[in-house]
Amino acid sequence: MGSEALVHVFLVSFPGQGHVNPLLRLGKRLAAKGLLVTFSTPESIGKQMRKASNITDEPAPVGEGFIRFEFFEDGWDEDEPRRQDLDQYLPQLELIGKDIIPKMIRKNAEMGRPVSCLINNPFIPWVSDVAESLGLPSAMLWVQSCACFCAYYHYYHGLVPFPSEAEPFIDIQLPCMPLLKYDETPSFLYPTTPYPFLRRAILGQYGNLDKPFCILMDTFQELEHEVIEFMSKICPIKTVGPLFKNPKAPNSVRGDFMKADDCLEWLDSKPPQSVVYISFGSVVYLTQKQVDEIAFGLLQSGVSFLWVMKPPHKDAGLELLVLPDGFLEKAGDNGRVVQWSPQEQVLAHPSVACFVTHCGWNSTMESLTSGMPVVAFPQWGDQVTDAVYLVDVFKTGVRMCRGEAENRVITRDEVEKCLLEATVGPKAVEMKQNASKWKAAAEAAFSEGGSSDRNIQAFVDEVRARSVAITGKSTANGVALDLAEKSAEINGKVDLVETKTNGKVELVEA
């Protein structure tokens, strides 16, 4: 890995596709700036990543640094269905993680790779507790919009009124944000949310916000300027997005849980801006009736389409969705249905005209950065808030629905209307122009010297400054005491430093 030691950051991810992808992308950005990055998540996900993305145990060079993987057992059997219940899984993950992560940190130090910083994403705020116990600085990557971060912050601290059981239909006015209707705030905050465990999981991070020295966000300054400026006065925020754009990172270093189908050759055969791309992410599950209506709406519209239909997890207890009889035959070569796709490449393909999306933040950032208009089909969580921004603020989309709170099936006629509005006519032209402007702004942000690039460099510089020397027993790698005891012949104070010749941990006399 080279003769000169690299400052080492250790990333711990919640094992969800929407969490793994942005944190791994951040890891590649940090590695490209000359850091050694270790990415860690439970082995149950590591196994899927190895199979889908050809991940190996060898460090992969990225720019001036390297990225490597260390997965850990979460204490449950591979086919344990309780992983699908966050109320049960999150406490288990915390119990195991608080024990095994320190051991992994110490092992890395013993191997000559002392860790200088821990970084986690939402749902696992206890990682900052682990860092604190080891004397390590920590940071957190927020994987939703800054607008949603602001909403959760104000809800957690009770700073503005939110819908309640007594007043379920009130509007919400948050600082530097548009007025949100009761069903446009992140749905986990609804008083009647069917996902109270997700509300607890997200808000858990806000009880630990005083511990990370930096909150990194997968957004960019120009996209959410006002709310970023406001929240930056409260929290140490650095915008580092869009993370999925990284020209220095090899495509082989990916975090997909499923191997993508080869659909690019089919797209190559289609005229420019003629294909509608449909994907509802890794966790949204539609009803069979809704799938049928989308299918018939596609046929009525006559547009070409690429539709991602991911099968539900085997332990989720959900029925396998099927397409209407004769649907594929009627579509012919006009349509293609796959289980998973290389979304970044699909959105960048000249044949794709628009993106029918659930409006998760990863997909939102990818659509904006690719200059892709959207048809907004949010369901729950931050998706409903993201849809407001895509349609009303960024003006790159049309709205097909308002989310699960509507409690209705979107009809085939509504599907057809939205597809045509987003692909032909003056509205489609306007949306494409706006999307192209955001693409240019995103490219400027992540290019060398752009706002996000500067923030990543500033973060790297701060991590390096914090790791210059680690003194005495309060060592950032958690092993100074063990090493000092083995070096009893050294009198006086013992310092633990990382040398610049071989990256090994050495004890030197103070």
From Swiss-Prot:
The active site is at H19 (proton acceptor). It is an enzyme of class 2 (transferase). Coiled coil: none annotated. The keyword Cell cycle does not apply. This is Gallate 1-beta-glucosyltransferase. An anthocyanidin binds at H19, G381. Glucosyltransferase that catalyzes the formation of 1-O-beta-D-glucose esters with hydroxybenzoic acids as preferred glucosyl acceptors. Has the highest activity with 3,4-dihydroxybenzoate, vanillate and gallate in vitro. Gallate is the predicted native substrate of the enzyme, which thus catalyzes the formation of 1-O-galloyl-beta-D-glucose, the first committed step of gallotannin biosynthesis. It comes from Quercus robur (English oak). PROSITE patterns: UDPGT (PS00375). It holds the Pfam family UDPGT. One of its GO terms (molecular function) is quercetin 3-O-glucosyltransferase activity. Belongs to the UDP-glycosyltransferase family. Expressed in swelling buds and young leaves. Gene3D superfamilies: Glycogen Phosphorylase B. It catalyses: 3,4,5-trihydroxybenzoate + UDP-alpha-D-glucose = 1-O-galloyl-beta-D-glucose + UDP; vanillate + UDP-alpha-D-glucose = 1-O-(4-hydroxy-3-methoxybenzoyl)-beta-D-glucose + UDP; 3,4-dihydroxybenzoate + UDP-alpha-D-glucose = 1-O-(3,4-dihydroxy-benzoyl)-beta-D-glucose + UDP. Its EC number is 2.4.1.136. Keywords: Glycosyltransferase, Transferase. UDP-alpha-D-glucose binds at Q343, H358, W361, N362, S363, E366, D382, Q383.
